[in-house]
A protein has these predicted regions:
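A detector for small-residue-rich transmembrane helices and their helix-helix packing motifs
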Residues: 1-233
C-alpha cells in the first residue's frame, strides 16, 4: 500500500514528446517577453510575425522548384519548421495540449525516434499534399503555419493503435475513426461560425492519413507485434 502511495499520480511524458513540445513553448515565452518589452526592444511586439515569416511554408516555394526543375535546399527547412510557430497563443495552447496528450499515448507504443519521424513526417507530408491540392484550386494559397498537420499525424497514429486493438478483439474497426470524425466536425462548425476555414484542413487531413500510414512502418515490431502486445494487456 505504501508503495502505491509513493508512486506519482502523473505518468512522465516521453522525452521525444518534450523534444517536440519545447520549441513551441520556448517560442511562446519569447513572444510574451517581446510583447512585454523585455526582448527585441521596440520591435518585440512583432516577434511572432517575424518568426512566422521565417518559418512559414508557402506552397509557391515547391511549385516554383517544380517548374524550374531545381531544389532550393536553403528553403526546405520550412516543410517542418512551420509546425513549431503558431499564429496566436490560443493556437499554440491547442497544439501543445494535443501534442502532449496524444504524444504520451503514442509514445508508449512507439520508440522515441519513431515519434519524432511520425510528427515531422506528417508535417512535411501535409505541406506537400497541400501544395499539390492548391495547384488545382483557384486563388492564391495561404501559407501554412502552426502545428495542426503534425498533430493530426499523432491523431492518425493513435487511430492506428485503436484500430489494431479493435482488430485484435474482432470488434468494429471503424470505431477507431471516431476521434478524427469529431475533430473534423468541430473544425467545420468552428470555420462556419468564424468564417476562417480556408484550405488548411487539406494539410491536416493529409497529416492524419500520413500518420496512420506511417504507423504500420514505425510501430515497434510492426503490426504483428503491436497486436500481440495489445492482447497481453
Amino acid at each position: 500500500m505504501r508503495d502505491g502511495l509513493n508512486q506519482s499520480p502523473l505518468n512522465p511524458l516521453p522525452a521525444a514528446v518534450w523534444l517536440l513540445a519545447l520549441p513551441v513553448i520556448a517560442a511562446e515565452v519569447v513572444f510574451a517577453l517581446g510583447r512585454a518589452g523585455f526582448v527585441g526592444g521596440a520591435e518585440g511586439v512583432g516577434l511572432r510575425l517575424s518568426a512566422m515569416q521565417i518559418t512559414a511554408f508557402a506552397p509557391e516555394m515547391i511549385q516554383r522548384m517544380w517548374s524550374l526543375g531545381v531544389i532550393d535546399w536553403d528553403q526546405l527547412y520550412r516543410l517542418v519548421t512551420y509546425s513549431f510557430v503558431n499564429g496566436s497563443l490560443t493556437h499554440a495552447l491547442f497544439v501543445l495540449a494535443f501534442t502532449l496528450a496524444l504524444g504520451n499515448l503514442v509514445g508508449r507504443e512507439f520508440r522515441p525516434w519513431a515519434v519524432i519521424v511520425l510528427y515531422l513526417g506528417s508535417a512535411a507530408g501535409g505541406a506537400l499534399v497541400y501544395t499539390a491540392a492548391m495547384s488545382l484550386l483557384p486563388g492564391r494559397p495561404a501559407p501554412l503555419i502552426g502545428g495542426y498537420p503534425a498533430v493530426y499525424g499523432l491523431v492518425g497514429a493513435f487511430t492506428f493503435l485503436l484500430w489494431a486493438r479493435l482488430a485484435a478483439t474482432h470488434a468494429n474497426r471503424l470505431r477507431a475513426f471516431t476521434l478524427i470524425g469529431m475533430l473534423l466536425l468541430f473544425q467545420l462548425v468552428f470555420g462556419v461560425i468564424f468564417g476562417n476555414a480556408g484550405y488548411g484542413w487539406i494539410a491536416e487531413i493529409a497529416g492524419f492519413a500520413i500518420g496512420f500510414g506511417l504507423s504500420f512502418l514505425l510501430v515497434d515490431g510492426g503490426v504483428a507485434r503491436a497486436l500481440r502486445h495489445i492482447r497481453q494487456r
